[in-house]
Amino acid sequence: MNLRTQIATLALAIGWSLVLAHAEEQVFFAFDDHNIAWQHNLKLTLVPATKHPDNPVLRRGPKGSPDHGHAVLYGTVIKEGSKFRMWYLGMHETEILKGQAPGWWRPMCYAESMDGIHWIKPDLGLVEFNGGKNNNICLIEGELHSMTRVNDFLSILHEPGDPDPSRRYKAAYIAHMPYEDIKGGMSRIGVKEKRVGVTICATSADGLRWKVSGDRPANAGGERFEVSGLYRFGDFYYTTGQLISPWSWRPDGSTAGRVMLAYRSPDFKTWSQAKAFAYARPGQLVEPPVTGQQMHMGAGLWNRGNVMVGLHGMWQDADAKPPKGESWNYGVRVDLGLLISNDGIHYREPVPGFKIIPRGPEGAWDDIAILQGHAFVNEGDQTMIWYSHWDTGSKLKSMEIGLATLRRDGFGYLSRKEDDNDAHFITSTFTASEISLNVDGITADAPLTVQLLNHLDQPMEGYSAQITQDGVHRSIAFSKPLPAGKKIALRVHFPVNSAARLFAIYLNP
């Protein structure tokens, strides 16, 4: 490598590190009781999402297509420029045999949209299927065939600033590999299966043509793992997912149903064998545990810079054993609940049991179980969330993809609890050049008053203002610029007659 190349490579690496270190917009959500811990006379109200009237917005394909059996968003939606991009799991057969997709393969399929509602499945021309390449299957190449066969949840991470163009898209997915294919083997914890669920990582320059990373699964040498998440938070990449006893257990060593665990890597190459206990539903940790309550497949996650927000599967066992001849999980029901994490490792549910996206009423297309994806986009004044339906009876009924929407970042809001008293909160400290609020319900005779505080909660002279109008991004106009580089906090006051609802605070660096 000549000196010019070395300098260019170093510059790219430095630029990449600066991109990673650069603080983007921070969000203090109304349901974040770490960043909005100090409250007086306030209550939190969560808001269920509204399902699109034309659901499902992405349907399975015709006979002979790779998604004729199902099209499920065990996958990812991102927006690049003006285009929405979706990676989802297809299945070409219309029948599940022995509890698995044919050949332990559900192809990584791809779709595009200009509005997030109307989707096309482009002919990528990359993978031979049913006698031709006119399909929307993404290409995955690797040394071992069994490592290229996606069979469950695929998570896509887009990092356009990566200095290596071939790594600007990253993926983690579940493959079911024969033990003899796994270099390094697996741990002796748990029960040995015919095939083992492993974490496969891959990289791509365009999100369509993928190369498997390395010659072994990321969890080689460890336990089976159903990976269902991939993100970068701080200095590490994280994969999150699901595990169950005997491969995992509650913190005291006792038997656990499905719980969420996390692994990490500093470079997307070497992954920890040690893992963190990321989340379990409250009923799973009491003694005795709540019967039938589990969390399903980790969480569909959204990295907002300073916090992770997500939706997790609220699994409830069937009331009775399945009738003879039915699937083992016949009667299982799943809704989607809200999660948040301030460290990218440990997650909590702001209001345990609240359903942000509930399954539909009996007879609706999504009436059995709801599946989450990494599929959140803020578009204008709304938040768009895509999800899919799971037929736990294994008949593949309506296993397609739907859309739900909220007010922009409108998962929940703070408002006064008692009508005849004022209210306020104080945030954690931060640095910012601009502050704005996501708020509604403000009236001319009841504006919100905002006051900057120093790190000792003392008011700062010249930094008081009133919010007199609603808006999803209502800027606070102080009489002078915010103090550069100083740790400050924000006090927001609701007068006695206020009907205001505050959804979020935005802090621009």
Predicted regions: what is each one?
Residues 22-509:
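Carbohydrate-active catalytic/glycan-binding domains of CAZyme proteins
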